[in-house]
C-alpha cells in the first residue's frame, strides 16, 4: 500500500470511527438474500443519509462475518459504502437487542 492509499484508508477508518463514537441515534436492519445469507446493519444518520457503521453477515453455512471501522474488509467481504434507504432497500427494521445478539456471535 503506497502513502496515498494509506492516507485514504486512515481517513476512511477515522470517518466510520467518528460516526460510531458520536452517534446519538442508531438504526438496525436485516436482510436475507437469495442465497440464504442473513445480513444485519447498524446505521447512523449523516448528511441526510443512513450510513452503515456495523455490518454482520451470517452465511448459509452459519459463518459470522463482521465489519466495522475496526475491521473494514477481508478476503470474504467489506463494510458497505452505500447508505441504507429503508423506503427503497429490501430491509426490515430490527431491535438494537437483536442486532447486538448477532454482532456478539
Where in the sequence are the language-model features?
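Negatively charged, low-complexity tracts enriched in Asp/Glu with abundant Ser/Thr
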Residues: 2-40
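N-terminal functional modules and adjacent low-complexity/disordered segments of proteins
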Residues: 10-14, 24, 59, 67, ...
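Generic secondary-structure transition motif, activating predominantly at the C-termini of alpha-helices
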Residues: 17-20, 45, 83, 103
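Short, compact, well-ordered microdomains
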Residues: 74-105
